[in-house]
Each structure stands twice: as C-alpha cells, then as structure tokens.
Amino acid sequence: VTTLRERLPVTVLSGFLGAGKTTLLNHVLGNREGLRVAVIVNDMSEVNIDAALVRGGEAALSRTEERLVEMTNGCICCTLRDDLLEEVDRLAREGRFDYLLIESSGISEPMPVAATFAFARDDGATLGDLARLDTMVTVVDAVNFLPELAGGDELVARGLDQYEDDERTVSDLLMDQVEFADVIVLNKLDLVDTATAERLAATLARLNPAARIVPVSHGRVRVRDVLGTEAFDLERAQQAPGWVRELNGEHVPETEEYGISSTVFRAERPFHPGRLWEFVTEGLDSGAFGQVLRSKGFFTLAGRPGVIGLWSQAGSVARFEPTAAQDEEAPFAQELVFIGTGLRGDALGAALAGCLVTGDEVGSGALDDPFPAWDVHGVVCE
C-alpha cells in the first residue's frame, strides 16, 4: 500500500494570464534546495510559450533531476485530462521525483484539475493512488485583479474561450481561482502602493478565509510556501469560500480598517421577479450599497414554484440558474451572502426586502418575469 508520504506530492499553479505563474515557477526551480522536481506546463497555444520560458529561465532543467512535460493546444481541466492522468501516472511510477509542479493555463479553473486526482480509470484505479494533491496555489496580479474583476469581459471576446459555447467571464474565472486556493500568492506588489496592497490582501482573505496569503514581488516565494505544505483537503476546499462560511454561520471577523465586510440576507417569501430583476440590473452595481465584489447563495422566484435558484455574482457579472428542487420544510426561501467594500448592509437588506412578493401579489395571477427561462430538466422531478 502506498502511504501518504510515499505518494508523489503535487502542487497545482493557477492564475489568470499575466499574473506571474511562469515567473514564480522559474523562481521555485532556481531555488529548489536540492529537491528533484518534475514540471508539467499547460499552455493553450500551439507553441508552448510557458515551456520555452521555463527552459530559458534562471533554472536550467537537469535531465537527471528534473523533467519538463509540455501539454499544448488544450486545457488540462477538460480536453487534456486523459493526457494529464497518463503523465502524472508515469512520473509517479518512476519514483525519481520529490515533487511535481503543474502549471495550468491562465484560463483553467482549479477545481476540475483537482478532481482529476479522484477520477477513476477503466481498471478502477485513481491517480490519487500514486500521487496526492499537496497544494493548490493561485497567483493574483496585484495591479489588475480588481479592475479585471469589475470589468466583466467575456473570455470569448478576448479569444480565450476554452470550448464551444464557453460563456464564462474573466470575473467568473478569477473568483473560481481565488476561492479554491490553499495558498494565494499576491504578486507584483512592487507595482502598487502599500494601502492598495493591504486592501487587496484583506479582500482576498474575505473571499477565501481558509487560504494563506503570501505577498511577493517578481514571484519570489519561499519554496516551502508552495511545496510540501500538505494544505490541500477536498472537503475543506469545498467549504473554504467566504460565502459558504457566512451561510454556515462562521462569520469572518470584519476587516474594518480596509472597509471590507459582509452581510447575509434571509427571507421566507419568494422574490417578485420583476422587482428583483430591476434591483439586479440597476441597483446592485449602482454604488448605492457600496462596492459589492461577490454575492452568492440561493433564492426563489414567485411564479417558478418548486425550484431553488443559484445566485452567483462576481464583480460586474451575475448569473442566476436553477440548482435544486425546493424543500417545502426549509426555513428560508432566500439565503444570500454579499461581500464588498463600504457595504451598507441595512440599506442592501431593505432593498432586497422590497423585492419580496407581498401577500396581495401571491394570488393575483401572473407576475412580470424578465428573468431568462430556466431549463429545470434534471433539477425538478417531473
């Protein structure tokens, strides 16, 4: 039986394009303190630019101590998962390496990469039998993180779509990468002032209270910050995002000096779809309630009985999708968490309360409903 210590420890590097993943990778390889490190680099282009940078960086790859595997023209969280399985399996079986570093592409979500380690092959074996996820690292660009989050650009508009009908936005991706991290490397701090750096660190701590935040410039982390931390735990990772903790009643202490806080809205009645739509499209992003960086939770709409919706907003982008059949015995129809700077929680709560359906409206017939139709197949039993 392969023990925890014997299995090949794996660190996965995530982060949006330009955040500094390859610079950090080069720094780790150049300061690896005698450790034997294998590297898998994933780049979406036909020519693997990241692999070339690693080869030409300060850490020349030794054929005896290190191995560089290139994966191009696809993303390891979807099209190249079988290739990733094969490569990690091979490297683990060789038994020559102390650590494996995987640099995912700038448009990869970390959770599917992590799930690869639990993916069962045809023979029933999993990658986790030979290798173990040790640390999920996300590199954040201190200069561009908040502007990109607020921008709301679609990946397809930048030519960064991963698959057909890829509807994700930059905001979605940034939030996924931050919320699933064990370690968040806040990079490029030499390019921002102290106040901005402190506010960013506090914001990231609110979005993912469980992650360790490592402030650096030029990707210069200590090797022990990203290798051999034994920080990854799938169950903990799924409960790590700040919004999940708030809904569970695990309130994160306020970081008042930076003006970052959170508020929870709960209600028993469903929302009036017309009033809620007006609030979402005109009120939420107006600044009247502060700057809402993240909101997420569960909600119901009058006129759509039996269905619970998932509310997910990151920066300027909000999504509303059906997620489950409604439990008639559940105490609340609405459970929403809002995280942001300068939040006016009372005003936000009052505005949301004003969107709830009234007793008179319940039996008054069809309500104005501008929300897109929901495909509830597979969500609600017919």
Tell what function each PLM region has.
Residues 2, 145, 154-334, 345, ...:
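C-terminal accessory "lid"/substrate-recognition subdomains
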Residues 2-172:
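Nucleotide-state-sensitive switch-loop elements of NTP-binding domains
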Residues 51, 81, 111-114, 194-198, ...:
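Conserved strand-to-helix beginnings and helix N-cap segments that scaffold or border functional pockets
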